[in-house]
Structure formats: C-alpha cells, structure tokens
C-alpha cells in the first residue's frame, strides 16, 4: 500500500512536470504584437494622401458654405426691404421661394458632407484591405502569432506600428497607383 501511495505521488509529480513543460513550451511559442491602427493609417503615405484630400475638400465645402451664407443673408435683407413695398401675397411667394432655396442648399451641403465622410471611410477600409497581407507577412517575419490593436492591450513590449508604416509605404505608397476594384 505504501508503495502504491509513493508510486501515485511520483506519477502525479511527473504529470505535473510534463504539464508545466508543455505550458512553458506553449507560452514561448506565443508571441503577441500590438498595432496602432489609427497611427498606421495616419502616418502612412496612403493615409496622408486621403487625409489631405479630405481636408482640402472640407475647406472647399466650408468656403462654399460661407459664400452661400453671405448670399443668403443679402437676399434675406433684400426680401425684408421688399416686404415694405410689395403686397402680402407676393411677399409670401418670395418668402416661400427663399425658404425653398435655403432648404435645398442645406440639403446639398449635408449631402456633400456625407459623401466626403463616406469617401474617407471607404478609403480607410480599402487601405486596411490592401495592408492586411503586408501585416500578415510582417507578423510572420517578426515571429508573431497574434497581432492586437493597441487599444485592447494594457501593456505591450512589441508594438510594430512604426515598422508596419514603413513596410506599407514601401509596398503600396500613397495608393494612387493601386487600381480600385
């Protein structure tokens, strides 16, 4: 009986050692890296091009909006002056036409902003679709088994964002040469 107890203890000890060895080997083979996706896009040539295009278009839209606002204010003042010299029915027609014009301009402005935001989102998505194989290859080269977004990690010793920006820039540049599908 004593022999069985002793054998059992040795068996348990050996199983524990084996399990510990397996855990140690497994933990050594798992290498996790982090990536700042926003920084990758923002700092890449592709992302810089898209952000500049969106910024330029936003400035054009703002300038157009300010110009239209100035025109509408002038037209509104003119309508206010006319109100004193024209009949009520004619004023109501002019006011309704002015209101319709304002609503149309607001609608067009909103539509232009939505279109610009959609373009920005689509280009960002396209960038990550193109960059994914590059990130996979880079992860393999660095021996990473997992790549996480930096926002999901409390501490990381292996952030590959800067390396990824360099690699993506070398492969896809600013993205103008890539034919969209």
Give the predicted meaning of each segment.
Residues 2-11:
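Bacterial N-terminal signal peptides that target proteins for export
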Residues 11-20:
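Bacterial N-terminal signal peptides
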Residues 26-181:
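Amphipathic, charged alpha-helical segments and their helix-to-coil junctions
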């Amino acid at each position: 009986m004593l022999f069985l107890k002793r054998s059992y203890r040795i068996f348990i000890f050996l199983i524990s050692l084996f399990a510990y060895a397996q855990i140690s080997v497994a933990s050594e083979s798992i290498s996790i890296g982090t990536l700042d996706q926003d920084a990758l896009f923002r700092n890449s040539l592709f992302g810089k091009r898209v952000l500049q295009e969106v910024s330029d278009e936003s400035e054009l839209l703002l300038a157009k909006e300010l110009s239209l606002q100035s025109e509408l204010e002038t037209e509104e003042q003119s309508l206010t002056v006319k109100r004193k010299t024209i009949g009520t029915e004619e004023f109501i027609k002019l006011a309704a036409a002015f209101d319709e014009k304002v609503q149309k301009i607001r609608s067009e402005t909103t539509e232009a902003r939505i279109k610009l935001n959609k373009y920005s989102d689509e280009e960002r998505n396209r960038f990550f679709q193109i960059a994914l194989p590059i990130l996979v290859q880079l992860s393999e080269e660095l021996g990473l088994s997992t790549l996480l977004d930096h926002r999901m990690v409390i501490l990381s010793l292996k952030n590959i964002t800067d390396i990824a920006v360099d690699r993506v820039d070398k492969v896809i540049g600013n993205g103008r040469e890539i034919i969209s599908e």
